[in-house]
Amino acid sequence: MMKKTILSLFVAVNITLVCGQVNTEHLMRVGNNAMYFNDYVLAIQYFNKVINAKPYIEQAYMYRAFAKISLEDYNGALDDLDRAIEKNQFIPHAYYARGYVYNRLGEYAKAESDFSKALELSPENTSYLIGRLEAYDLQKKYTEELADIDFILRKNGSKEPQIAIEKGRVQLLLGDTVAAFRTMDSIVGRHSYLAAAWGGRALINMLMEKNDSALADYNVAISLRTDNAEHYINRANLFYKKHNYRAALSDLSKALELSHNNKMALFNRSLITFEIGDYNKALADLNQLVKIDGKMYEARYQRAIISQKLGRHREAIADLSKIIERYPNFAPAYSLRAESYNKLQNNKASYRDMQTAIQIESKRRQHKKTSAKDDDELNNEAKIANSESGVSDWAKLFEMTEDKGDDKFGKNSVRGNIQNRQVDVKPQDNFVLSPYRINKNVEPEHYFSAQLNRLNDLHKNDMRLYFVCSEIPLTDALVAYHFKNIDLISEKIAADKDNYYNYLYRAINYTLVQDFDNAVNDFSEAIKLDGGSALAYMCRAEVRRKKLEVAISSGSGNTKSAAQEPVEATDKKFSHDFELLIRDYDTAIGIDPELFFAYYNKANIMSRLQDYNAAIALYTQAIGINKKFAEAYYNRGLTYIYLGETQKGVADLSKAGELGLYEAYNLIKKLR
């Protein structure tokens, strides 16, 4: 839940060099644009320019650190955050970000200190508190963690069900099973749509050996969310206890579909297949498991047992020797190895191992004054997901958030969640002009535009453009290429100020480097020179949309997801901006009524404005022009579902899947 927060600096200035002085405010803003759209390499280049021009600006170091965090360059981020704090010791978010970095680097005490400092400067900031929760958790300071959790819950109450789930987990870690159950039971009653709540209560029931109740809870959790491998693993354990091996194996196989190298699922499945006599399948799982983790000695021990049964005594001896090397007082390993040596007629080695096993057992009986587990004892029973050491890993237990994409500092929440439904979805993005296409998203024969084809034919020596709905972040080389293009085209414009194509191509280059102000200006110049260019109007609308997303994000808590939530059409703060871009779409459609991308993009905007009937009408118009427009079917399907017309929505999703948007099938499955 630790989200990045980007401060916005919106000042209308140019990116160009003026009288030898870099306009740093504009560079900061464009760098923030790049951050917002996940172009972290590009963002770093902008912040580098600011730092080179004005090394005393602490925000540039801080924002560059954010970009480095998103690229998992934690040491580089730490250096930048140290510099930012050195220049200004009163920026709470710098301490918050550095705390996050310290957690990633394993310096948990320093992380705790930084989160506490951030809270001194901003005492009730929930994000900072959540950061400190993580630091406490990683240090096993569960009492302190519980105190912070209670503070958040008093402050935010029912708005934080995931934090309430965390409370149940921490209570469980503190050994208060009854309190943990009460907490989880309360959440299930108040937030029955949360799979994590049902899974949490199921785990506690399971640990309390209330197996029927646990099974019932896991059934609900899995019906609400079908992609949690741990839920399937634990339900498989419950099925196994009921001797329903078929159901147990089915659940474990499903867990492995979701998490291919899940060690618990592989181990547990090997135990069941061994028990029913399918030694080869059990051995295959154990081979995979040892390949993943050669230090999982329970797997080696189980593999040795199976190898013996299959007559592979040398393989058994190899595994048992590894175990004995690690656990020299584990008597069963000596006994088993003695059997294999005996089968290979190595009587001396067999006798030696058997004597060692007898001596260890004798000493163990003499010194057995406690029921505590011996250090050299392997747990060869089925594993319960998140019940032992894994219970302290918050990311895997109960799933703190129903949105998997939001547990990293540099990741943003999914777009367009359908509210009050148990399906995590995002609509397909708008189409934009780009020289870079991802083949799975764009099929040229289906996505034909006469205007774009003419443009590409006329300018074969320039970059070829495509309509795409999935943009790629730029590499260093591509960033340099587009800046060079901007310089070259600027020289052409200086020589000929009346060339429509030069402004159009420079605008596209500005868009690619996230310089939206200059892009809008150039698209506007292109429109002045050729008012019949539907492409220029549509491109200007898209740049205005991107600017608006960043502006909304800045004004609503600095989160990207907030910028993509539905907004009221009457919101005066942004109504003029929406009006401008809708006007551009309408003009593009008026010039080229066959430009189905413009209908689709406008439909996405109308959906944002909660005018769902208008959105459906526009998606329908786009589909009328292009019967193979998968993205339009997909988004129209989501809109129908939101309006409660599930049958129509599923039909559209089915068509989208047929046309290649395979995520539609997963969504259909969840809706059933």
Question: Language-model segments: what does each one mean?
Answer:
Residues 23-25, 58-59, 92-93, 126-127, ...:
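Helix-start (N-cap) detector for alpha-helical repeat units in TPR-like alpha-solenoids
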Residues 29, 63, 97, 131, ...:
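Canonical tetratricopeptide repeat
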Residues 36-37, 70, 104, 138-139, ...:
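Register position in tetratricopeptide repeats
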Residues 49-50, 83-84, 117-118, 151-153, ...:
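Canonical positions in the second alpha-helix
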Residues 53, 87, 121, 155-156, ...:
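Structural marker of alpha-solenoid helical repeat scaffolds
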Residues 309, 325-502, 556-577:
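Eukaryotic alpha-helical solenoid repeat scaffolds
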